[in-house]
Amino acid sequence: MDKQKKGIVEKPVFECGKGIAIQGYEGSFHQVAARNIYGKAVEVIPCATFRDLIRIASDKNASSGAIMAIENSIAGSILPNYNLLQKSKLKVVAEVYLSISQNLLVNPGVKLEDIKEVHSHPMAILQCLEYLEQYNWKLVETEDTALSAKMVHQHRSKHAAAIASKLAAELFELDVLAPSIQTMKNNFTRFLVLQREKEAIDIPMANKSSIYFQTNHSKGILAKVLTVIADAGINLSKLQSMPIPGSNFKYGFYADLEFEQRAQLDQVMEGIESLTNSVKVFGIYQSGKIVKG
C-alpha cells in the first residue's frame, strides 16, 4: 500500500459551511464517509437519489458540495453515477475508501432470542446472509440501512433488529448486538468528494486524475491511447467502458490515472488529444486512503 493509502500525505481542507449532500439518510455510510473527510461536526443534506445529490451539490445556495459513492469492491462500479458526473459541472477533489462493516442493531436490552425480524437494505441483507441464516428470522427489505435503524428506534420494538452502520447505532441510540456480521470482511466502497467547478480548490501533492474520453472507434485506436498513458509512466488503475447514449453500440471510457509528477498527466492529455473525439477531466486530486466504516 502506498503512502497515500496510508494517509501520510498532507490532507486538504474542504469548506462545508452550507452542508454536504449525501445519498440516503443520516447514519448511512455516505455520512460515515463525509465525517472522515470533513470531521464529525459536518452537517449533511440527505438526498433520496443520486440525481438529487448532484442537483443539490450543483446549487451554491443549497450546499458546499457532495460525497458520492462510485464503486464497491464486491458489487463493482455504480455506472449511472458516472453518467451523472459527466453531465454535471462538478469536480472531484478527493476520494476515500470506506471499509464497510454491517452490524446487527437492536433497542437497548434486546437479546438475540427476542428477535423475530431483521430490517435492512437488500444488499446489506445479502452481504450478511451467512450470519442471518443461522436464525429463523423474517428478513424485511427496506430502502436504506440507516432508515431501518431509525424505524427500529422509533417503534421501540423488542422483536425487530436492523443491519446498519455503527454511526446509525450512535445516532438512534441502539445497541450493537453483533458487530461486523457481513460474510466478506474485505468490502470497500469508494466515495468521491465533489465541489462545483468554480469553487474547486487546487489540491497540493495531487497524484491521481479521473477522466472520460471518446475515440472514433477506428481499428487499434484504444490501444494507441493506452500506449500514450503507459509511455508517460502513468498507472492506469481503472478503465471502465460505457455505452454512448444514442449511438449504435459505441462506447466512451472512464479512466483513473495515477502519476508521480503533474508533467506526466500533462504529457498524456497532450498525447491523446489527436486520438480522441473528446476528453473531460473530472478532477485532479490525492489518492485516497482506506478508513473504517
Briefly describe each language-model feature range.
Residues 1-293:
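Domain-level signature for soluble enzymes in the chorismate/prephenate branch of the shikimate pathway
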